[in-house]
């Protein structure tokens, strides 16, 4: 196994570290400062109408309800004017967000593919080690049969030598898998 941790497709989401709600609200307030002003005027008119209603002043109540309607109209105009004025900037922001999303998806996909490749390579390494150990175990079992029959032993030894040489090349010329297993089990150098 490698020392470094494998990348995972379940890593932390970087969207969390970008604009949070307060930053977005601050940006919107800077972009369209008249909208919150209209909302505040509407709320103030409703509050004054409520107080006038509690006091029983119907003239002031009607005046405040009219003020509320004017404040709401002002708010709607501010929203419409702001949307027309900032339309190109919002389109650019949407395109930038789409590009960033595509980049994030591509990075996540690349990390996922790299993770799969690493795991596949580890599986192949494990299978090759397992096959090598299995071949070494079979080689130990076959050897007593070779020693029993003298005429066949010479033919088998000649046919096994190329196989041993090819096995030596795979293992880096260390004397073969069989000798490595013998060294491990009998403690010789």
Curated annotation (Swiss-Prot):
GO (cellular component) term, any one: mitochondrial membrane
Chain intervals for the UniProt region annotation (Disordered): 142-189
GO BP terms: mitochondrial respirasome assembly
Oligomer status and interactors: Associates with the respiratory chain complex III/complex IV supercomplex.
Sorted UniProt keywords: Coiled coil, Membrane, Mitochondrion, Transmembrane, Transmembrane helix
Coiled-coil parts of chain: 86-122
Function: Cytochrome c oxidase subunit which plays a role in assembly of respiratory supercomplexes.
Family: Belongs to the RCF1 family.
Domain HIG1: 6-97
Coarse class of the protein's main subcellular location: mitochondrion
Biased composition, class Basic and acidic residues, residue ranges: 154-172
Topology within the bilayer: Multi-pass membrane protein
Pfam families for this protein: HIG_1_N
InterPro entries in the record: Hypoxia_induced_domain, RCF1
Cellular location(s): Mitochondrion membrane
Protein name per Swiss-Prot or TrEMBL: Respiratory supercomplex factor 1, mitochondrial
TM region(s), chain numbering: 33-49, 64-86
Domain of life: Eukaryota
Mitochondrion listed as a keyword: yes
């Amino acid at each position: 196994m490698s020392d470094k941790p494998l990348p995972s497709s379940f890593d932390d989401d970087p969207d969390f570290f970008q604009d949070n709600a307060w930053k977005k609200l601050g940006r919107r307030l800077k972009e369209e400062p008249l909208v919150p002003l209209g909302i505040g005027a509407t709320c103030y008119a409703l509050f004054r109408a409520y107080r006038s209603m509690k006091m029983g002043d119907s003239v002031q109540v009607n005046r405040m309800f009219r003020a509320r309607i004017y404040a709401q109209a002002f708010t709607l105009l501010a929203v419409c004017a702001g949307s027309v004025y900032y339309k190109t900037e919002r389109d650019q922001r949407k395109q930038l967000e789409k590009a960033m999303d595509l980049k994030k998806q591509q990075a996540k996909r690349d990390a996922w593919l790299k993770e799969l490749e690493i795991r596949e390579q580890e599986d192949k390494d494990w299978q090759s080690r397992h096959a090598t150990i299995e071949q070494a175990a079979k080689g130990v079992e076959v050897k007593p049969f070779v020693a029993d029959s003298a005429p066949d032993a010479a033919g088998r030894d000649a046919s096994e030598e190329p196989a041993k040489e090819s096995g030596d090349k795979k293992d880096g010329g260390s004397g073969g898998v069989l000798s490595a297993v013998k060294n491990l089990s009998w403690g010789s150098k």
